[in-house]
């Protein structure tokens, strides 16, 4: 029997479910956006631990806690037969029964709470805390909050893992930048800014999940995804599984990968997921430039960090990309390029044939499996009850601290887009009309990638549990064109002091495998809002969902008194919205995306990856958009007023020689360009009557270096907690050397001599100018892209 046939027989015997279903249907993935994959679920395998006390491995090096993790993993893998080795190259690994090595599931989810866990029906381990979607959390501009959320998720994940109900590797965070306003998964990301926001989110989330910066004992393994150039699902029939994204070296370096550099170099992420799409003709999971030249040789990916394919993307290297001549070649191309573990069954089914045909070697396959098990060693998988996190239990899941932080994230992220003084509601308001498809929601609060929550508070729930008299009417559905519910809605509005409409978009319109074709309010929601606005009563609109919709008609309608963006606010979302509306809490979130006018979606194809304006493309993201947005990136109103001023010493340095900057000592920093160029320090005074948090975005702009020039770019952000009226507080935002560099056409980060400007927020409340002198200098060298591996 050949090696290939032997492996297939073993797989069918061990895993009669998912792994007995190889991809032989040959779906047309050029138009189908979902992989034909039925992965083994956590619920159907035994997630126990190896017995290093009395089991077959107890006397081997893998159970020796004094040995190096790599050596322990290598010793384990060296004991595998070839068939056993191949069996353990997929996300659903059967382990090695003869060695007492249990099955293992690589694929767990932790985007904003536990998902793909084996939840019980009731009682212990039946739920986990559900935080807001990342797009809303990032809008809070609070680094500490991101880290707290990730830390809690990791704690709860380890508690579930200790009873065999969750894995130790999580497919999170999603750090792709939200470039296209129509992208269905933009809700999962930290917004449209790659260099500053996505990178900061990556750092805080990864270090929270993993328990620090490359700790000796990993808490969980985070997976930075999707690497790289992935930001469409199925736009106009262009499937994510077959998209070939044409990206210049300049924008690949400037926009599509800097967050992955931070994830690898600074946060020391231990796993990276290669994406479905191809870039410049090469599928990401078969792209040695991405996975070796950039990730490992340039970005400094940890030595035993492993690359996981997105689910079935190794198969997609053949179908639909046709980069490889057949599925066996796709498996060989992917492993040789640096994709260590296959989320799917392609490796498990086709490595035998690839080995027989001498397209792969045992050493190439071992490399990936050793990397996976090195991380499991670092996670304490082989350490028995002595594992650092083995004492976490259900009691560590049931904590009001986690619930409070979920609520806090929702409150801090909510953005006040428009307000004429109607909010916060006056004390005299007694009755409210609650209308719209988002008013009485449950799991819709959670967005996507979620598990059961301990509770879900809808806006209707929250108001019903307050002192208001509530008149509720559904009104209309998200995408409905029926007006059958209008009369009931108008009736409820007429007998109320204030009208609140909650609508927008949801996961029926934006989701994984689903992009929008427009950025307008769907259905007849605007028609109903317009009729409500004619009743002569205060009207508040809650615009919900991850992506933005064109709310220009609401912005210009004087009878729409207030407009709030609430994202997907999680388990306490309704309470958070109530508390903002009533003034118990004050809004301070800022948009981390641009709200474009509706015609933007029709001007150029979403598959155009170029950010810089050209042809019919008016430019993408706040950095390059040449049109007039409905609401700018960074927009957000307060219930109070603030005054920002420089301390005024007049002694701060405003001229810097480039060569002096780059030759100075840099203790505490791995690279000199990570050092602060200057500290932007301002005094913030609450000049109004309401206590409020204050949020700031610091932008840079220049005409130094070659044209075209971006409008501006984000170099820092911060949040001050609860500033009382007439009180002042100092805020300092470090501006690093790297943050004022620009990217040349070859992808290099360059410091150019010339005049620069730093401006606080969109309103430019404080402006600081400085000059760089000397000679231009490359501070980050983008490696020359070479020919990729030849297809097998």
UniProtKB/Swiss-Prot annotation:
One of its GO terms (biological process) is xylan catabolic process. Belongs to the glycosyl hydrolase 3 family. It catalyses: Hydrolysis of (1->4)-beta-D-xylans, to remove successive D-xylose residues from the non-reducing termini. Gene3D superfamilies: Glycoside hydrolase family 3 C-terminal domain, Glycoside hydrolase, family 3, N-terminal domain, Immunoglobulins. SMART domains: Fn3_like (SM01217). Glycans are attached at residues 23, 87, 118, 142, 246, 326, 385, 404, 440, 477, 518, 679, 701. Xylan 1,4-beta-xylosidase involved in the hydrolysis of xylan, a major structural heterogeneous polysaccharide found in plant biomass representing the second most abundant polysaccharide in the biosphere, after cellulose. GO terms for molecular function: alpha-L-arabinofuranosidase activity; xylan 1,4-beta-xylosidase activity. Residues 1-20 form the signal peptide. Pathway: Glycan degradation; xylan degradation. It comes from Aspergillus fumigatus (strain CBS 144.89 / FGSC A1163 / CEA10). This is Probable exo-1,4-beta-xylosidase xlnD. It holds the Pfam family Fn3-like. It comes from the Eukaryota. It is an enzyme of class 3 (hydrolase). Its EC number is 3.2.1.37. The gene is xlnD. It is found in: Secreted. GO terms for cellular component: extracellular region. Transmembrane segments: none annotated. Keywords: Carbohydrate metabolism, Glycoprotein, Glycosidase, Hydrolase, Polysaccharide degradation, Secreted, Signal, Xylan degradation. The active site is at residue 310.
């Amino acid at each position: 029997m050949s090696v290939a046939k032997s492996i297939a027989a073993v797989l069918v015997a061990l895993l009669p479910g998912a792994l007995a279903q190889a991809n032989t249907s040959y779906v047309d993935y050029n138009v189908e956006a979902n992989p034909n994959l039925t992965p083994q679920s956590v619920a159907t395998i035994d997630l126990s631990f190896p017995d290093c006390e009395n089991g077959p491995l107890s006397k081997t090096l893998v159970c020796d806690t004094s040995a190096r993790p790599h050596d322990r993993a290598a010793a384990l893998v060296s004991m595998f037969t070839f068939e056993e080795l191949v069996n353990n190259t997929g996300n659903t690994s059967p382990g090695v029964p003869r060695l007492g090595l249990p099955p293992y599931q690589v694929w767990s989810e932790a985007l904003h709470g536990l998902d793909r866990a084996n939840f019980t029906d009731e009682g212990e381990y039946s739920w986990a805390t559900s935080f807001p979607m990342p797009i809303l959390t990032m809008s809070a501009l609070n680094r500490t909050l991101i880290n707290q959320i990730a830390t809690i998720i990791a704690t709860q994940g380890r508690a579930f893992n200790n009873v065999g109900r969750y894995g130790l590797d999580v497919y999170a965070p999603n750090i792709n930048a939200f470039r296209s306003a129509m992208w269905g998964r933009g809700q999962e990301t930290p917004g449209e800014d790659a260099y500053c926001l996505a990178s900061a989110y990556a750092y805080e989330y990864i270090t929270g999940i993993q328990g620090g910066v490359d700790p000796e004992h990993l808490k969980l393994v985070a997976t930075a995804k999707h690497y790289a150039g992935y930001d469409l699902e199925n736009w106009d029939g262009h499937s994510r599984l077959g998209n070939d994204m044409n990206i210049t070296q300049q924008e690949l370096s400037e926009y599509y990968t800097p967050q992955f550099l931070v994830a690898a170099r600074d946060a020391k992420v231990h796993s990276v997921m290669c994406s479905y799409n191809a870039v410049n003709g090469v599928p990401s999971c078969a792209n040695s430039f991405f996975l070796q030249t950039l990730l490992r040789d340039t970005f400094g990916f940890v030595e035993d960090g492993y690359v996981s394919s997105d689910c079935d993307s190794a198969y997609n290297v053949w179908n639909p990309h046709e980069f490889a001549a057949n599925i066996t070649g796709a498996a060989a191309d992917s492993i040789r390029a640096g994709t260590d573990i296959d989320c799917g069954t392609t490796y498990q089914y086709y490595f035998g044939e690839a080995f027989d045909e001498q397209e792969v070697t045992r050493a190439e396959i071992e490399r990936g499996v050793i990397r996976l098990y090195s991380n499991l060693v670092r996670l304490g998988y082989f350490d028995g009850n002595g594992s650092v996190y083995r004492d976490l239990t259900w009691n560590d899941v049931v904590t009001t601290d986690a619930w409070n932080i979920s609520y806090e994230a929702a409150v801090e992220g909510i953005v006040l887009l428009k307000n004429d003084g109607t909010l916060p509601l006056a004390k005299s308001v007694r009755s409210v009309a609650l209308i719209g498809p988002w008013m009485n929601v449950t799991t819709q609060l959670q967005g996507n990638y979620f598990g059961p929550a301990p509770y879900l508070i809808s806006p209707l729930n929250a108001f019903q549990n307050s002192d208001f008299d509530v008149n509720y009417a559904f009104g209309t559905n998200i995408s409905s064109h029926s007006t059958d519910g209008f009369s009931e809605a108008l009736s409820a509005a007429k007998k109320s002091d204030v009208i609140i409409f909650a609508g927008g978009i949801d996961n029926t319109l934006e989701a994984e495998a689903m992009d929008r074709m427009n950025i307008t309010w769907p259905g007849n929601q605007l028609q109903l809002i317009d009729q409500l606005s004619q009743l002569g009563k205060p009207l508040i609109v809650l615009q919900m969902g991850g992506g933005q919709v064109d709310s220009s008609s609401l912005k210009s309608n004087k009878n729409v008194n207030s407009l709030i963006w609430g994202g997907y606010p999680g388990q306490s979302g309704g309470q958070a919205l109530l508390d903002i509306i009533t003034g118990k809490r004050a809004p301070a979130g800022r948009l981390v995306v641009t709200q474009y006018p509706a015609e933007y979606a029709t001007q150029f194809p979403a598959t155009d990856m170029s950010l810089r304006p050209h042809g019919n493309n008016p430019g993408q993201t706040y950095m390059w958009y040449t049109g007039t947005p409905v609401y700018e990136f960074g927009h957000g109103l307060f219930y109070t007023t603030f005054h920002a001023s420089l301390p005024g010493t007049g002694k701060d340095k405003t001229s810097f020689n480039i060569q002096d900057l780059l030759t100075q000592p840099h203790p505490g920093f791995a690279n000199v360009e990570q050092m602060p160029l200057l500290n932007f320090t301002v005094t913030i005074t609450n000049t109004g009557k309401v206590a409020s948090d204050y949020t700031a975005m610091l932008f840079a702009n220049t005409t130094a270096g070659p044209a075209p020039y971006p409008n501006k770019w984000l170099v820092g952000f911060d949040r001050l907690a609860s500033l009382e009226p007439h009180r002042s507080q100092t805020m300092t935002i470090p501006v690093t050397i790297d943050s004022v560099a620009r990217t040349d056409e070859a992808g290099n980060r360059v410091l150019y001599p010339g005049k620069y400007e730093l401006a606080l927020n969109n309103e430019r409340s404080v402006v600081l100018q400085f000059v760089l002198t000397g000679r231009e200098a490359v501070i980050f060298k983008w490696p020359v892209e070479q020919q990729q591996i030849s297809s097998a």
